[in-house]
UniProtKB/Swiss-Prot annotation:
Keyword terms: Cell inner membrane, Cell membrane, Membrane, Symport, Transmembrane, Transmembrane helix, Transport
UniProt GO molecular function: fumarate transmembrane transporter activity; malate:proton symporter activity; succinate transmembrane transporter activity
Name of the protein described by the UniProt record: C4-dicarboxylate transport protein
HAMAP family: C4_dicarb_transport
PANTHER family, alphabetized: AEROBIC C4-DICARBOXYLATE TRANSPORT PROTEIN, PROTON/GLUTAMATE-ASPARTATE SYMPORTER
GO cellular component terms attached to this protein's record: plasma membrane
Gene3D superfamilies the record matches: Sodium:dicarboxylate symporter
Protein's organism: Cronobacter sakazakii (strain ATCC BAA-894)
Broad class of where this protein is predominantly found: membrane
GO biological process: L-aspartate transmembrane transport
Membrane topology: Multi-pass membrane protein
Gene from which the chain derives: dctA
Pfam families assigned to the protein according to its UniProt record, in alphabetical order: SDF (PF00375)
Cellular compartments annotated: Cell inner membrane
Length: 428
């Protein structure tokens, strides 16, 4: 029992995170130097994301009997994304207005260091709906894979899958090659995941060593408010959706606990993407659904980022005494409904989208972003964790709506009946 515990990735990553926190706190300079360990692990994961998405989507679509099912899955997924992310935006807006974490700070925007956020503001001006949609189309297929742009790879994979499906038996050889290649890729993922504890240790040691616990105390009310809101969203909103779909949210969280710990250590939901594709398929969701919903959700279903965007924007307004009436807040909500959909497709993710939104609304000082620049790194964990759980739940819901979910396999896996059956066979 003890040996299996020590060998489990869950225990190893958890231990690594704890050691990283201690090192960063007591030896901050040494902790800050551990950054390359976390960066290297995330780069290894990003290296494999494009081929994983390509193989999963192509084999999923090419193996389907009807192409109408693919279109139906995509439409249902986008509808779900829009509804749930809107709920997340509204919840963030309501909570920040009730708690008012920025009230009483009385910060003069003129005293803030605008240079600190100048890079983000400049990048935000380059972002727009048209630019985002145009960016989905790659200049070249090789460029899409080289840059690791998820949506570009997804677009090419969908087109490739459709074309391969139309070939019928003539394309069987290509299908078999891609399926075999997929098995090799997942073998590489298993090797990379053995390094997850080292990556989590390095990333956490750097975070604590670089920013220190003192940063948390200064703006702690916003951080606590945000974390509690994310927990409530997962338990209440996603929990209700899960219950209506026929599974328990806590059992699902237990099922993906290793992926959650990897995300917690690296602050990047992308680090768990390859394993999520595999795990959601083992949970009973058809490969074609998993291949479409998970990668698309990384740009269109960022629940944690949605909560962060509304809370951060209103917090800046409260801290700088920039009054926001109901009209301003509705305008903010409408702008975020559009701008939040490209959060994962831009460098700097949520922070740049926040800068773009504040610039578009025009009522808030862009320099106010400097207030949360220092604590943004600490809030990224909750964003990434909520995003991961949200995309997992979305996959199950969409799979059930389009009747591509094996509910018996879902319940057996979440209730550990499969592992219990294997144990019984071994003992007998």
């Amino acid at each position: 029992m003890k040996r299996s515990l020590f060998k489990s990735l869950y225990f190893q990553v958890l231990t690594a995170i704890a050691i990283g926190i201690l090192l960063g706190h007591f030896y901050p300079e040494l902790g800050a130097q551990m950054k390359p360990l976390g960066d290297a692990f995330v780069k290894l994961i990003k290296m494999i994301i494009a081929p994983v998405i390509f193989c999963t989507v192509v084999t999923g679509i090419a193996g389907m009997e009807s192409m109408k099912a693919v279109g139906r899955t995509g439409a249902v997924a986008l509808l779900y994304f829009e509804i749930v992310s809107t709920i997340a935006l509204i919840i963030g807006l309501v909570i920040v207005n009730l708690v008012q974490p920025g009230a009483g700070m009385n910060v003069d925007p003129a005293t803030l260091d605008a240079k600190a956020v100048a890079v983000y503001a400049e990048q935000a001006q380059q972002q727009g709906i048209v630019a985002f949609l145009m960016d989905v189309i790659p200049s070249s297929v090789i460029g899409a894979f080289a840059s690791g742009n998820i949506l570009q790879v997804l677009l090419f994979a969908v087109l490739f899958g459709f074309a391969l499906h139309r070939l019928g038996r003539n394309g069987q050889l290509i299908f078999n090659v891609i399926e075999s290649f997929s098995q090799v890729i997942f073998g590489i993922i298993n090797m990379i995941m053995r390094l997850a504890p080292i990556g989590a240790f390095g990333a956490m040691a750097f975070t604590i060593g670089k920013y220190g616990v003192g940063t948390l105390v200064q703006l702690g009310q916003l951080i606590v408010c945000f974390y509690i809101t994310c927990i409530l969203f997962v338990v209440v909103v996603l929990g209700s959706i899960a219950r209506a779909t026929g599974f328990n949210i806590f059992k699902f969280i237990r099922y993906i606990r290793e992926e959650l710990l990897i995300v917690l250590g690296t602050s990047s939901s992308e680090s768990a993407l390859p394993r999520m594709l595999d795990k959601m398929e083992k949970l009973g969701c058809r490969k074609s659904v998993v291949g479409l919903v998970i990668p698309t959700g990384y740009s269109f279903n960022l629940d944690g980022t949605s909560i962060y965007l509304t809370m951060a924007a209103v917090f800046i307004a409260q801290a700088t005494n920039s009054h926001m009436d109901i009209f301003h807040q509705i305008t903010l909500l409408v702008v975020l409904l559009l701008s939040s959909k490209g959060a994962a497709g831009v460098t700097g993710s949520g922070f740049i989208v926040l800068a773009a939104t504040i610039s578009a609304v025009g009522h808030l000082p862009v320099a106010g972003l400097a207030l949360i620049l220092g604590i943004d790194r600490f809030m990224s964990e909750a964003r990434a964790l909520t995003n991961l759980v949200g995309n997992g739940v979305a996959t199950i819901v969409v799979a059930k709506w389009v009747k591509e979910l094996d509910e018996k396999q879902l319940n057996d896996t979440l209730n550990n009946k499969n592992s219990a059956a294997k144990t019984q066979q071994i003992s007998s």
